[in-house]
Amino acid sequence: MPLNITQNLYNVAKQRMRERQIKINLLNYEYQTVDEIQGYVISGNINCDSNNDQRRSCSITLVLKENADFEIKSGGRIWLDRYVQIYIGEYNILAKDWEWVNLGIYLINTPTWNYDASTNSLSFEGLDLMARLNGTRNGYISDMPTTIPQGSNVRNAMINVLKLVGITKYVLEELPYALPYDIQVDVGDSVYSLLSQLRDVDATMEIFFDVNGVFRYQKIPSGHNEPSLLDDDVWDNIVTSESITSDFESVKNVVRVFGKSLDPTYYPSAITQSGNTYTLTIADYPTSFDNDTSFTVGWTASTAVASPYIKVNDNNALPLVNEDGTAAVLDRNNQYYVARYQNGKFIYLGYQQIYGEAKDDNPQSPYYVGSTIGEIAIPLSGGEYDNIYTNDLARQRAKYELYLRTRMNDSVSLTCVPIWWLDVNIVVSYTPKDSTVPKQYLVKSFSADIQESGSMNISMIAYYPQYESF
């Protein structure tokens, strides 16, 4: 979700002197405002972590401005059927007005109301809306085991799952391929478990609720072709400390992913090659096909070719294509390959042992394989990797794992005056204290103290434009 950064918000971010207010809207489950709480913050914090599906959380204690009844009970202002939407306001010295920023919508947890002759305070924790899906507040599957069959559209499957818990606000991207295997959860499992399995079909996707309470399923932003939304014009006014750490034990600059070991439906008894066409002799090969016909074929290619065709027995030669429809490339001599027949064409899956590799080949990276550190490799197999059923998906996963094991370890942490409109997975420009050259970073997490004198801690990873997007 793109940030809407106005000039007024930008100006306030540069102010050294801050005057701060908090406003809390009480919402029903239709996201309609039904009440409002105003007060002075005694303590509290806002947290956001892009590596956690429960992206946002908060904890707030405030002295109430009013002498209203905040008894925690059914039908009261604070109860299980309420969301809280938190706004932070800061006074704009130039515009002589308040600038308000939405910090997210939360479920109320552990509320406490204290009222006596000298006290009228309210404290609570705010849970990410994912708590409605993972069993914390709701989301258990109670009727019967649920199965999403192979071949299903992942986006449509997610929509149907969200309907189970009444989530109607969502933005879901399409995957270019269908669900490659059955997904099943048992009674007592959570809706979140089902959604996370659908997400994990492609390791480069993420699920989360944004600040407006919208459920999102999208590519994890890599920073590729994104503009910097913050630079030293702001940082120079607000940064109070900086730390740079590297976890050498976690650094890996070569990642090898071993996916599913494929067992083809049909094996040829003879193979011939003419140009880019392979002719396979298969005795028990089907003689009739319809739209539902699907099976796999395996064969050994003696030479590597581009834009190959597969001809079985006396049938017409059919193109071998990737799942996105582009022509496949057989990249190794004497390699055993597997393809799936579907809808009148062969879809390239990969080697019989699905495999993908990624290396840090960017000379600008401190973990470049051509530097003095050489190659530091890690093989990944078994468990969730067994669900990876094409070489292309294995390569994508390897690129993502490389990102986690290199760029996530080239990081900087800042302490600064809070920037309330900041969000995770945005690109910023910052000049480290030991350098005179600005570097680009991706914001990965932050935590902010919402008291008047509170500060913000920000964790960022280095972004290298030379990297291709994963």
How would you describe each model-predicted region?
Residues K96-Y106, R332-N334, P432-L442:
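Short coil-to-beta-strand transition motifs
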Residues G75-L94, D290-T296, W420-T431:
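Short coil-to-beta transition motif at edge beta-strands of beta-rich domains
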Residues N45-N47, L133-I159, L172-Q197:
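Short acidic/polar beta-strand-loop edge motifs in secreted extracellular
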Residues T303-G350:
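Acidic, glycine/polar-enriched metal-coordinating patches/loops
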Residues T265-N315, I347:
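Exposed extracellular interaction/assembly regions and N-terminal maturation sites
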Residues M1-S142, Q184, L195-T204, F208-V211, ...:
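Assembly/oligomerization scaffold segments
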Residues M1-Q32, S196, D200, M205, ...:
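Acidic, small/polar-enriched beta strand-loop surface segments
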